Structure formats: C-alpha cells, structure tokens
From Swiss-Prot:
The keyword Aminoacyl-tRNA synthetase does not apply. The 9aaTAD motif is a transactivation domain present in a large number of yeast and animal transcription factors. It is found in: Nucleus. It comes from the Eukaryota. GO terms for cellular component: nucleus. It holds the Pfam family HMG_box. One of its GO terms (biological process) is neural crest cell development. Residues 15-50, 446-462 have a biased composition (Polar residues). One of its GO terms (molecular function) is RNA polymerase II cis-regulatory region sequence-specific DNA binding. This is Transcription factor Sox-8.
Amino acid sequence: MLKMTEEHDKCVSDQPCSPSGTNSSMSQDESDSDAPSSPTGSDGQGSLLTSLGRKVDSEDDERFPACIRDAVSQVLKGYDWSLVPMPVRGNGSLKNKPHVKRPMNAFMVWAQAARRKLADQYPHLHNAELSKTLGKLWRLLSESEKRPFVDEAERLRIQHKKDHPDYKYQPRRRKNVKPGQSDSDSGAELAHHMYKAEPGMGGMGGITDAHHHAEHAGQPHGPPTPPTTPKTDLHHGAKQDLKHEGRRLIDSSRQNIDFSNVDISELSTDVISNMETFDVHEFDQYLPLNGHTSSSSSLPSDQPPAPVSSYASSYGHAGVNGPAWSRKGAMPSSSPSSGEVGQHRLHIKTEQLSPSHYSEHSHRSPPHSDYGSYSSPACVTSATSAASVPFSGSQCDYSDIQSSNYYNPYSSYSSSLYQYPYFHSSRRPYGSPILNSLSMAPAHSPTGSGWDQPVYTTLSRP
C-alpha cells in the first residue's frame, strides 16, 4: 500500500507523465487508502488488494503512460500484500458494529448549527477560535435564548433512546501508563516517604520504641521498604535485582542528612560511605573468596578495628542507656583508645574512596588481639560521653551503621553463616542496623559492658 501511494504521489508530481491531471490520481489514491479499513481478515485483505490491483491496472491503461504502468507493476509484483498488517483499532469484534455516537446536548446543538453558519460566512476563521467564541457566546445567552437548543437536545435524546434501546456509553479507555514510568513514580513517592520520615526521628528513645515495636509487629514505623523487597529478609534467597534496587533506594535516602546538626569535618566520611556502599556486596559476589588477602597484607595492621570499636561503642552504649547516643567526634580523650580511634578514622577517610580497598577490608579477618584491646575501653568512653552529649535524631552515626557494609570481617563466609542480622544492613533500611543492634545487644553483652570475645573466635576465618 505504501509503495502504491508513493508511486501515485510520484505521478502527481510528474505533471508531464500524467495526461489526465491531478484529481484522477488523487481520487485513485483515496480509494486505495480507504480499502484496507474494511474489517476483513488478512487473507480477505490480500484477495481484495489483488482484485484492486487488477482494477488499477485496467483503469491505469487509459490514465497513466506506459512508463508509469511498467514501474508500478514491477514494484507491486515482488511484494506480498498479505503481510501488510490490518489497522486494528480497539476490539476487532466491536469494529463490525457501527459506532453509535452519544446524543448531542444543548450546547452541541447550538455549536454545530452556529459553526455551519459561521464557517460559510467566514471561511478563514480557525476552528479552535470559532469554538472558543461559540463557548463564550453560549455562556452569555439567557435561559429563554437557550430554550430552543435545550428542546432540540431533549428531542434528540428521546429519539436516540428509541433507536438504540440498549445503548451504553463506553468512553475510550486511556492507554495504560508505561511500566517504567509508574515504577519511577512509586520510587519517587517511596523516597519522599523516606525523606519525610527521617527528620522526625527525634530522640533515641523514640527510635528504640519504634524499632522494637517494628521488630515484633513486622510492620515498620521507620522508612518503608520498597514494595518489591521481602519484609523480613533473614532468609537470603531474595532475588538479586530486587535486593540491589531496594538497596539503591535506601542508600539514596541515607544521603538526606540534616546539615544544620552535622560537623563539616564529619561530612566527608558519611557522604563517601553513603555514596559507594552498594558496590561492596557486588564485589563480594564476583570476586574469589581470598581474592585480595595477599594485597591486604600491605595495609597497616591496626587500620580495620576502628569500625569495630565504633560498633562496640554503639552496642555497649545501647545496652547501658538507650535514649542517648554519642556523636563521632564527641568521645572524650580520657582513654587512649579513643584517640587511636580518631586516628584510624582519618586513615579510613583517605582510603575509603577506592573500591578495591572496600573489598580488601571486607575480605580481611582482623587480628583477635585488637578486638580485646578495643572493645571494652571504647564502651567505657561511650558510656561517659553518653551523659555529656545528648543525641539528636539526625546526628545518628551514619558511618557506624554503614561500617557493616564496607568493613565486614565475615563477608567471605556464605550468607547462611551470618548469625546476626545487623551484618546484612545492605539488605535492610538504614534504621534496621540500629534496630537490630538495640534488640540484639543483650545477647552479646548481658551486662552492657562490651562484646564477648567468643563471637569473633567462632566466626573468624579458618
């Protein structure tokens, strides 16, 4: 069909070739374009078009010169017209019935009559402008002036009811929104909920209550998880793509820090760790188990335990008094370990940028002596700093929460060996590491003094 119309257009533009003017070829073109709209099947359409082609040939004998006829037949000969798809509009079965229009209302009666009259008088008027003017005029009409149009509309309605007793108005359905678009909308809405929930976290007491309640009820009060990820993710058979999607959403929500309460010096580690966290587990999936152990030996041996001491501080702290939590820079330098912790922070701040260091941290099992030396003093300092530094919700130590992502001594194990769920923080919303640490802390430290040594000896690498 398309090539036929192209040929005809060529004929139209080629005035010397076509002896009988444009109108004849145009009418032929119109008859061609109208033909496929008849609701026949593809076979019927093929036969219809072949008969049409014969008719075209017989008519073209007089209408077009021999050069054009030969060119057209040459083009049409090699084309299988049964392959041309029928234009399907809506339901094929409904197309067999003629479309019944709704009866006109009073305004339509007025507008149609007035438009005909005006179009005859002022043919240069644009249709849209005409419609606007007719609408304005209709609003200015009084009830008595509208009466004849209202009566006519009523008569048409009654007539329509007689003609089509079982008529039901079926407006055209809008096409469904593209799936990608709806997903992004729900994602944006979800992120909006997360951002909205974050500044209102208030004091730590509220967090502990809410998260304990969420732990028991299974319906979180914190930022909602994405609708696709499972609610309780302790079984790690979840699909990888869902996990990554959820993690990206959550990580993007973590970046919304209340900058009025955060020291600028702390910001670099927080932002960097938040930006790059989801890469770590992707490295863990694709790298061999001991991929970086050889190169990790060149790292300073005292570097990794800094996050562990911050773990110990937060967990011991939660055991001692929940409602207050210390900021990073607020630990008093009363014990030597807190100063060293600060130095280690600086080390990590410089090294965090390269992803290979992430994997080196995560594949490496630190020396056990460090745990013994760092866990209990850090708890003491955190307990003292708890009294001195009250906690405000947005000062939550993001990099401590994150540290299970970029520094995880047990990531070389299979995920079923992870005993405690706060090592899976990448699969949960950012509040849940706090949640799990608060609820699980008594398991580690019944007295609230620190982490038990056997946890590390049992889980360290053989």
